[in-house]
Amino acid sequence: MKFSFVSLFPNLMEFYFQDSILARAKEKKLFKLNFYNPRDFSKNSYHKVDDYKIGGGAGLLMQAEPMYEVLRSIQEKKENPYFIFLNPSGKTFNQKDAKRLSKKEHIVFVCGRYEGIDERVLEIFANEIFSIGDFILTGGELPALVMCDAILRNVNGVLGNMESLKEESFENNLLEAPAFSKPFIFEKKNKKFYTPSEFLKGNHARIASLKTTLASCKTKFFRPDLFLEHERKK
């Protein structure tokens, strides 16, 4: 699998893949990375890529010409690129999207800055437009990294144990069940906090049943919207 990032600040992104799980996956050649800076495709002597909006309005906009050129150059490599634009007006990214997109050959994340990208570029290239929530960031780089991380977790071999995906939050519209580590009894300020006793008995069927019950309770409390969806699909 291949990921390309189109960004005015590629150095902000490269470091993310230098440690931990994703670094090991990259070393095993489970995915490849490319970074493209639109400034390298600007035709003016200052490598300028932004200008004022036609019709007025606050802020600057990333111009169509350099954005078109960089994306067209990616297209011409014929690596089956799938263009994803990061924009607050896009649909909210979720776990189902992460699973679906993990089957793509080559995802290109197009990261806007300033007040966004000339709309005509989206009309020409966008396969999908995503947001990660109803809030505004200074650029699309962080959402792109969030999405890339979530997608890669679903690529075979990236996680040490792919079975862990089955127990993670949002599977079957449930949050992941509460998890506990040693010690079995955690004591602070004369208070004792216990691990559920069923977890200590070694009966895997009963533990699995308890985890399902706890996941359901947790979802109902923290995410009633997900819980209703889970109940509807039973």
Swiss-Prot record:
InterPro entries to which the protein is assigned, alphabetical: Alpha/beta_knot_MTases, tRNA_m1G_MeTrfase_C_sf, tRNA_m1G_MeTrfase_TrmD, tRNA_m1G_MTases_N, tRNA_MeTrfase_TRMD/TRM10
Top EC class of this enzyme: transferase
GO molecular function term, any single one: tRNA (guanine(37)-N1)-methyltransferase activity
Pfam families: tRNA_m1G_MT
Cysteine pairs bridged by disulfides in the record: none
Binding site for S-adenosyl-L-methionine: 112, 132-137
This enzyme's EC code(s): 2.1.1.228
Record bears the keyword ATP-binding: no
Gene Ontology cellular component annotations, sorted alphabetically: cytosol
Catalysed reaction, written as an equation: guanosine(37) in tRNA + S-adenosyl-L-methionine = N(1)-methylguanosine(37) in tRNA + S-adenosyl-L-homocysteine + H(+)
Function: Specifically methylates guanosine-37 in various tRNAs.
Subunit organization: Homodimer.
Family to which this protein belongs: Belongs to the RNA methyltransferase TrmD family.
Protein name (record): tRNA (guanine-N(1)-)-methyltransferase
